Amino acid sequence: MPTEPPTDGNTYIIDPESGTEMARLMNQDRLITHGMGGIFPERDDISSMHDILDIACGPGGWVLDVAYAYQKIQVVGIDISRTMVKYAQAQAGSQGLDNATFRVMDALKPLDFSDGSFDLVNTRYIVTFMPKTAWSGLIGECLRVTRPGGTIRLTEAEMPITTS
């Protein structure tokens, strides 16, 4: 159910704390991963990846998938929603995924990580909450926390433009 428009610059119109939204995000995550051809469809060799950040991880589906499939990779998920992070932490704990961690963090603000912390920075479908004016700041933060030679992967839906 839609809530009052946010006043913090966030444009997400659905209550991110609702169980229904959490379930929708988990289903969406599975569909995106499957539709893309897997967790890392663009890579044949991930041996150089040791640390991964997932920005706006929601209930943690992609982080949990990576942590389960690649137990030597440390995966960190961040999200602004404490409810989502608590759920993701509980899932990681119940699955024994010590290589998956989750933190409450606002992607619209400077990220609380050291420079060059990650081999891959991933984010998907953040256009739902990102104001146009915040993109350059987020890209700058992604560049800052990505190691030299690392990858920034932004996945968004193509918005159809039509006059019919």
Where do the model's predicted regions map?
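N-terminal, positively charged/glycine-rich alpha-helical extensions of SAM-dependent methyltransferases
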Residues: M1-L31
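Conserved alpha-helix/loop element of class I SAM-dependent methyltransferases that forms part
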Residues: N27-D51, D65, A69
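Class I SAM-dependent methyltransferase SAM/SAH-binding core
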Residues: D51-I55, P59-P110, G137
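A short SAM/SAH-binding and catalytic strip from SAM-dependent methyltransferases
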Residues: D119-A134
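Conserved class I S-adenosyl-L-methionine
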Residues: T151-S164
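A short acidic, Gly/Pro-enriched loop at the edge of an enzyme's catalytic core
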Residues: L111-L120
